[in-house]
């Protein structure tokens, strides 16, 4: 029992190095380093470089591209270098330091000739011995790594590649999601037991190896302990050893991690996986593990060689000249090179890039408000010229106040804003919102797309239930969609007819004899379909939609808003009346919409339309777990239209006029259109006027938004008909880049809309409404930071990781991806399960980046004490800031910006 508890504890702690990977059909953004944020970004970067040779800093090409495009100010970098050197004193001639810095900051690689020089070996051996005697700081410690990583096979590749191939084969068999007609035997017992049963008959193992498998214990924890003992791994190194195996195939391990969280009977799935993997490693390594007992020492020796070569190359000091110095001087030189290694300068380039963006964002906001100040009547501005003379940035807040007051007065008179449209904070809504506001008396609002509703949706047109909220939060309620019984029966029959046709096709394709006949039967139809889809993608897509609407038309549906008893549900179905009032109040507060209601309030979810795109869920709403957010929007709108809810809100101080109506639309991000999801049958006259005004303005809004978006796509030249071109991109099944998604996301602004209204933020900013003056205890701000801001950071770091380390954290080229086991994509048939974003999602061309890999900048419009209180109360967020996983900036009531570093 002690052993079992110890192994389970080791595995539980080792999970930190991977992230749960959901199936591609419900793809949700994940921060690949969420479990490592207790350490600093820099420490994790160093550790990943040591254990997997993965570099998570932007490389030389990305840095040079950023400088060339004006995204990175070299003077900022040079100042950072100067400041760093002033913090330390080195007993080294200044000209050597200058040469070293001037050379290494270019990020040039050290030529192999320097590494192979005999003098470098001599110096490295000398320093290694001295560091062992003195326990010097420069001694570089390496964690123990899997034995199979240290052994090279006859083909010249690490033996771990053979282990990986075995694990990919077995994991694919176990995970398979309804694609194979013949599933893995005994999988219902466990992954480990199914493998034990089958591996005894697997002739890729020798007869002796199969005998070893036959004698393995039935308990996976005992098996793991046995292998670790066999390899003479010290108990304090168990976790590092297990982490090495999880990182070998983080995609497949991540998928198993996800499944272990979803189903009680699979909660020990990672334990099964590791037991199998360690056994396979033991079988393939054999007795060769005895030859790698000094692996850590040899890696340290190699590190010394690299550091010596770096000093000689960057300082322009030949190795024979280095040997002429005494050992203490040599140690000083090498200590300097170790301290000022290339990763340090990559980190400085990254910080300079982020500081440049921060500066450019501040200038945009200031410039935007200076132009507003010029347009405002001087009597509306609440300060005098003399007051501003010594406060150059104070125009920012005062202009915001003036605009706030101006809008509020006009709203109360009923002559200003016709419609208020609440969009998801998604960066793609920023340009669309800007064009809507420019088109008429419309106000836009930013809120997370799940609208504060912690629900699991059960939609009539979806096969499975879906958690429609951020993935880090479990659902608390289930909401069912239903329709009239007769309509529902007809719809179900139509669904069954369609699904039976597809099931028959799949059954024939996956069975030996029928699959031989299938090309003859389906060939003519599929050939015609291929030709039509290729030549006329937009028309064929439209025709298909018309056919679908005719033969599988979704009936008019309602939602289970009120609490219902359902013994089959593990979650409460629907809400009580008080819960409806509470959720409506919370959502309105999060939207900063508790007064001055327009006659027509639209809650706009968002969705993306693309064809033949396995990663379509990555373009959906991240706050809804990789699904469209129209369902949540409809639920909230229906709640807010209820008289009893409005009465309850009135008692809480929120009065919604009787003439105000809530409706629901969906922003289609791939075509920049607004599709109506729910509009009440009865509209007040002023609400109807607002509805018609918005509809009339939409064609022009879509054209402007599409033109702006299409100009950024690399395969587009001059666009004469942007709306038609956008629809073609969304319909074309050969299009690898129907839209950019959330690429180039860089900041998250929490504040009043007037802070950024009219400013072109280039579709790079998440915008969330917030007024600190209405949030006395900071609860709303903490909610925004703990939910929407966290989702934004996960999205940001997934894009970041897929750009800086695409081979490890990306998913490769879309054109060569293979959808595997119904859960994800691979490159070829023997790769890891790729769990990041594709190359086309972050790069414009082979050597031209599109996404700028910088960490998220969170901007809060509030006084310093409000931000300080947030950091004191929210340790999780404070740790992200202090450990450099994101950047934090605030703007106070005087309009002054502050960076919280």
Swiss-Prot record:
<keyword id="KW-0813">Transport</keyword>
<keyword id="KW-0472">Membrane</keyword>
<dbReference type="GO" id="GO:0008270">
    <property type="term" value="F:zinc ion binding"/>
</dbReference>
<feature type="binding site">
    <location>
        <position position="426"/>
    </location>
    <ligand>
        <name>Zn(2+)</name>
    </ligand>
</feature>
<dbReference type="InterPro" id="IPR018752">
    <property type="entry name" value="DabA"/>
</dbReference>
<protein>
    <recommendedName>
        <fullName>Probable inorganic carbon transporter subunit DabA</fullName>
    </recommendedName>
</protein>
<comment type="similarity">
    <text>Belongs to the inorganic carbon transporter (TC 9.A.2) DabA family.</text>
</comment>
<feature type="binding site">
    <location>
        <position position="621"/>
    </location>
    <ligand>
        <name>Zn(2+)</name>
    </ligand>
</feature>
<feature type="binding site">
    <location>
        <position position="424"/>
    </location>
    <ligand>
        <name>Zn(2+)</name>
    </ligand>
</feature>
<keyword id="KW-0862">Zinc</keyword>
<keyword id="KW-0479">Metal-binding</keyword>
<comment type="subunit">
    <text>Forms a complex with DabB.</text>
</comment>
<feature type="binding site">
    <location>
        <position position="606"/>
    </location>
    <ligand>
        <name>Zn(2+)</name>
    </ligand>
</feature>
<dbReference type="GO" id="GO:0005886">
    <property type="term" value="C:plasma membrane"/>
</dbReference>
<comment type="function">
    <text>Part of an energy-coupled inorganic carbon pump.</text>
</comment>
<keyword id="KW-1003">Cell membrane</keyword>
<dbReference type="Pfam" id="PF10070">
    <property type="entry name" value="DabA"/>
</dbReference>
């Amino acid at each position: 029992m002690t052993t079992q508890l110890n192994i389970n504890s080791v595995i539980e702690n080792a999970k930190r190095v991977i992230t749960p990977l959901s199936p591609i059909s419900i793809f949700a953004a994940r921060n690949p380093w969420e479990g490592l944020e207790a350490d600093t970004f820099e420490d994790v970067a160093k550790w990943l470089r040591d254990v997997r040779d993965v570099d998570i800093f932007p490389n030389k090409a990305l840095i040079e591209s950023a400088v060339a495009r004006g995204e990175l100010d070299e003077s900022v970098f040079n100042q950072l270098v100067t400041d760093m050197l002033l913090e330390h004193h080195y007993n080294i001639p200044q000209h050597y330091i200058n040469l070293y810095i001037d050379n290494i900051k270019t990020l040039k690689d050290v030529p192999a000739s320097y590494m192979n020089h005999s003098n470098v070996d001599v110096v490295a051996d000398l320093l290694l011995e001295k560091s062992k005697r003195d326990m010097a700081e420069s001694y570089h410690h390496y964690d123990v790594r899997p034995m199979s990583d240290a052994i090279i096979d006859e083909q010249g590749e690490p033996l771990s590649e053979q282990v990986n191939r075995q694990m990919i084969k077995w994991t694919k068999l176990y995970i398979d999601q309804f694609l194979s007609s013949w599933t893995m035997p005994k999988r219902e017992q466990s992954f480990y037991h199914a493998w034990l049963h089958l591996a005894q008959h697997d002739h890729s193992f020798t007869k002796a190896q199969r005998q070893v498998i036959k004698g393995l214990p039935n308990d996976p924890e005992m098996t793991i302990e046995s292998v670790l003992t066999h390899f003479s791994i010290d108990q304090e190194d168990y976790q590092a050893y297990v982490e090495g195996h999880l990182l070998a195939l983080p995609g497949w391990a991540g998928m198993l991690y996800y499944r272990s969280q979803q189903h009680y009977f699979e909660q020990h799935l990672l334990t099964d996986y590791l037991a199998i993997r360690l056994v396979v490693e033991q079988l393939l390594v054999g007795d060769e593990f005895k030859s790698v007992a000094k692996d850590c020492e040899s890696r340290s020796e190699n590190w010394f060689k690299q550091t010596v070569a770096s000093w000689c190359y960057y300082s322009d000091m030949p190795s024979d000249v280095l040997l002429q110095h005494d050992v203490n001087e040599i140690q000083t030189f090498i200590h300097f090179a170790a301290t000022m290694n290339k990763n340090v300068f990559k980190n400085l380039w990254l910080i300079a890039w982020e500081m440049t963006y921060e500066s450019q964002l501040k200038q945009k906001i200031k410039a935007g408000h200076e132009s507003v100040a010029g347009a405002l009547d001087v009597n509306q501005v609440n300060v005098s010229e003399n007051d501003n003379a010594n406060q150059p940035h104070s125009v920012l807040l005062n202009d915001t106040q003036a605009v706030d007051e101006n809008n509020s007065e006009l709203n109360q008179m009923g002559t200003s804003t016709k419609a208020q449209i609440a969009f998801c904070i998604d960066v793609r809504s920023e340009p669309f919102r800007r064009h809507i506001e420019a088109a008429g008396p419309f106000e836009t609002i930013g809120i997370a797309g799940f609208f504060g509703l912690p629900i699991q949706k059960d939609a009539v047109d979806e096969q499975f239930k879906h958690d429609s909220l951020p993935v880090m939060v479990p659902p608390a309620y289930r909401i069912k969609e239903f329709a009239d019984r007769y309509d529902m029966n007809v719809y179900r029959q139509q669904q069954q007819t369609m699904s039976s046709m597809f099931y028959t096709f799949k059954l024939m394709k996956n069975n030996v004899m029928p699959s031989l006949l299938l090309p003859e039967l389906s060939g003519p139809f599929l050939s015609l379909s291929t030709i039509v889809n290729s030549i006329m993608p937009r028309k064929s897509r439209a025709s298909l939609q018309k056919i679908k609407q005719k033969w599988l038309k979704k009936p008019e549906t309602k939602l289970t808003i009120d609490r219902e008893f359902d013994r089959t549900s593990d979650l409460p179905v629907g809400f009580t009346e008080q819960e409806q009032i509470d959720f409506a109040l919370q959502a309105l507060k999060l939207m900063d919409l508790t007064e001055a209601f327009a006659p027509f309030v639209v809650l706009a979810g968002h969705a993306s339309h693309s064809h033949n795109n396995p990663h379509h869920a990555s373009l959906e709403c991240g706050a809804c777990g990789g699904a469209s957010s129209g369902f949540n929007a409809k639920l909230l709108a229906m709640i807010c239209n209820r008289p009893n809810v409005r009465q309850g809100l009135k008692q809480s101080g929120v009065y919604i006029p009787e003439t105000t109506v809530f409706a629901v639309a969906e922003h289609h991000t791939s075509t920049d259109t607004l599709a109506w999801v729910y509009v009440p049958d009865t509209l007040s006259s002023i609400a109807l006027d607002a509805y018609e005004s918005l509809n009339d303005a939409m064609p022009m809004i879509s054209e402007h938004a599409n033109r702006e978006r299409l100009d950024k796509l690399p395969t587009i030249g001059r666009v004469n008909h942007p709306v038609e071109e956008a629809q073609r991109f969304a319909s074309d099944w050969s299009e690898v880049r129907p839209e950019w998604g959330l690429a180039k996301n860089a900041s998250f602004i929490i504040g009043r809309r007037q802070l950024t209204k009219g400013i072109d933020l280039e579709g790079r900013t998440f915008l969330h409404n917030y007024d600190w003056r209405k949030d006395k205890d900071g609860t709303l701000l903490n909610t925004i930071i703990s939910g929407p801001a966290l989702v934004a950071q996960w999205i940001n770091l997934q894009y970041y990781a897929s750009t800086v380390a695409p081979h490890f954290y990306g998913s490769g080229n879309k054109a060569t991806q293979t959808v595997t086991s119904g859960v994800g994509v691979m490159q070829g048939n023997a790769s890891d399960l790729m769990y990041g974003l594709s190359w086309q999602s972050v790069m414009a061309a082979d050597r031209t980046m599109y996404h700028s890999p910088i960490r998220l900048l969170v901007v809060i419009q509030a006084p310093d004490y409000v931000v300080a209180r947030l950091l004191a109360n929210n340790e999780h967020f404070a740790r992200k800031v202090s450990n450099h996983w994101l950047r934090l900036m605030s703007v106070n009531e005087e309009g002054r910006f502050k960076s919280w570093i």
